Amino acid sequence: MKKEILEWIISIAVAFVILFIVGKFIVTPYTIKGESMDPTLKDGERVAVNIVGYKTGGLEKGNVVVFHANKNDDYVKRVIGVPGDKVEYKNDTLYVNGKKQDEPYLNYNLKHKQGDYITGTFQVKDLPNANPKSNVIPKGKYLVLGDNREVSKDSRAFGLIDEDQIVGKVSFRFWPFSEFKHNFNPENTKN
């Protein structure tokens, strides 16, 4: 009987160590701050950020990521353009490599916009710190925008982000539990 109890205690201890390692080195929690991703992610909601998997699988357009905006702040935004993409917005319409792209995650904000446009018109070369002679996103850089474009501070304000600024990809929202969601890619976004 004592041996069985000891085995249970060891099993539970090992499970806690594994959970700690997974929590510390593979997935980390993040609390949404602000309204820049509303209604996809709202202020105060909690998400799990995969800090390893995106490095092996790569980032794709439409992924939602957390990144270091500066020494003190992390932001959460959607990847709009990846290295090698030619990105352009014309009157709220996204074109990547010359092809019009759907952005279903903007439906709510387009219906409730305050002005004429929520994204406007710009090209990669118009962004801060960009090469004024090229509309192509360079290697190691990403264009990120918030889903709530009218209030979001994103690549339009600070330019392309470096790959090494990225903390990880949002895997799922776990709080509030009633709003649990595990995939934020465009084809799975309805609002």
From Swiss-Prot:
> Which reactions appear under catalytic activity for this entry?
Cleavage of hydrophobic, N-terminal signal or leader sequences from secreted and periplasmic proteins
Q: What is its EC number?
A: 3.4.21.89
Q: Which residues cross the membrane?
A: 8-28
Q: InterPro entries from the xrefs?
A: LexA/Signal_pep-like_sf, Pept_S26A_signal_pept_1, Pept_S26A_signal_pept_1_CS, Pept_S26A_signal_pept_1_Lys-AS, Pept_S26A_signal_pept_1_Ser-AS, Peptidase_S26
Membrane-side (Cytoplasmic) residue stretches: 1-7
Q: How does it sit in the membrane?
A: Single-pass type II membrane protein
Looking at the record's lineage, which domain of life comes first? Bacteria
Which UniProt keywords are given for this protein, alphabetically ordered?
Cell membrane, Hydrolase, Membrane, Protease, Transmembrane, Transmembrane helix
Entry's Gene Ontology BP terms: signal peptide processing
Q: Which Gene3D superfamilies has this protein been placed in?
A: Umud Fragment, subunit A
Q: Name one GO cellular component term.
A: plasma membrane
Read off the SUPFAM superfamilies from this record: LexA/Signal peptidase (SSF51306)
The main location is membrane
Extracellular-facing ranges: 29-191
Q: Which GO terms describe its molecular function?
A: serine-type endopeptidase activity
* UniProt subcellular location: Cell membrane
UniProt function note: Essential for cell viability.
Provide the family line.
Belongs to the peptidase S26 family.
- The protein, known as: Signal peptidase IB
State the organism of origin. Answer: Staphylococcus aureus (strain COL)
